[in-house]
Amino acid sequence: MSKAMNADNPEPATKSVAAIAPSLKAEILAEALPYIRKFHGKTIVVKYGGNAMTEEKLKHGFARDVILLKLVGMNPVVVHGGGPQIDEALKKVGKVGTFIQGMRVTDEETMEVVEWVLGGEVQQDIVMLINQYGGQAVGLTGKDGGLIRAKRLQMPDRENPGTFIDIGYVGDIEAINPAVVKALQDDAFIPVISPIGFSDDGQAYNINADVVAGKMAEILKAEKLVMMTNIPGVMDKKGNLLTDLSAREIEELFADGTISGGMLPKISSALDAAKSGVHSVHIIDGRIEHSLLLEILTEQAFGTMIRSH
């Protein structure tokens, strides 16, 4: 059964770790030890998006957090979004982003923008920061090593069952070849994946980053999938945080419209990952500094846990 947490104040508790008392820091480090043992050698897929990608302090904190996970023996794989950056780039060419059921309508010009923003600007920024702090990150798109093979998405028209909506060059994942990711992991690198897929004839497709993260977690047999967002987690219609959701409860939230817009692909992908065998799937508030470490290395209840049963 879902547990609701009151969210009268939707702003995150952005207390910096630097402000925590030394004794509490020691407790946190001691608390992390069993989790470090538990997840040693395990793959952790992180969907990186929202404010954590645009606020400088959070960006630098995320880079350090990912490096720490690698240093203590885990295998983090980062799948990044970049919606705000794409919107900003589209404005410069006189276009406005349009979304249907949480998916960006992608014409030919928009696809070109998506490719150079995600596969270039955003990816390079993440890789640079991780490497700047002493990590070894390598950026990938779906073309590298045949990582993500995609076809044009057929989006069902909910108002006209049996028909489909054309949303352009939006991709549906046909297959993921994890060989290049596993090779990088074996050589102590941190893969940073842009959600761009390619068809056999070389056509690029814009794929929702949540969808890529969920499928990547499934194919890599990840221990955990953590999705970072701009909200505390899944909220009910009264603004309360739902800390634990089963498959049945998620279907009810879809049906009554509680989950809508950009949350649709996010929750669908999270649930699919849980059903596929990913042991732990969480949606967390990326606006909280070091939220990734708090989720993985402490007992602190955080965000929304997605269960397959």
Swiss-Prot record:
Annotated site location: Transition state stabilizer: 47, 266
Binding positions for substrate per the UniProt entry: 82-83, 104, 206
Residue ranges that the Swiss-Prot or TrEMBL entry lists as coiled coil: none
Keywords, sorted A to Z: Amino-acid biosynthesis, Arginine biosynthesis, ATP-binding, Cytoplasm, Kinase, Nucleotide-binding, Transferase
Compartments reported by the entry: Cytoplasm
Keyword Transferase (UniProt): yes
GO terms for cellular component: cytoplasm
Protein name from the UniProt record: Acetylglutamate kinase
UniProt family annotation: Belongs to the acetylglutamate kinase family. ArgB subfamily.
Gene3D superfamilies from the UniProt entry: Acetylglutamate kinase-like
Transmembrane segments: none
GO biological process terms, semicolon-separated: arginine biosynthetic process via ornithine; L-arginine biosynthetic process
Enzyme class: transferase
HAMAP family xref list: ArgB (MF_00082)
Reactions listed under catalytic activity: N-acetyl-L-glutamate + ATP = N-acetyl-L-glutamyl 5-phosphate + ADP
Involved pathway(s): Amino-acid biosynthesis; L-arginine biosynthesis; N(2)-acetyl-L-ornithine from L-glutamate: step 2/4
Alphabetical list of NCBIfam families matching this protein: argB
Gene label: argB
Summary of the function given for this chain in its UniProt record: Catalyzes the ATP-dependent phosphorylation of N-acetyl-L-glutamate.
GO molecular function: acetylglutamate kinase activity; ATP binding
Source organism per UniProt: Cupriavidus metallidurans (strain ATCC 43123 / DSM 2839 / NBRC 102507 / CH34) (Ralstonia metallidurans)
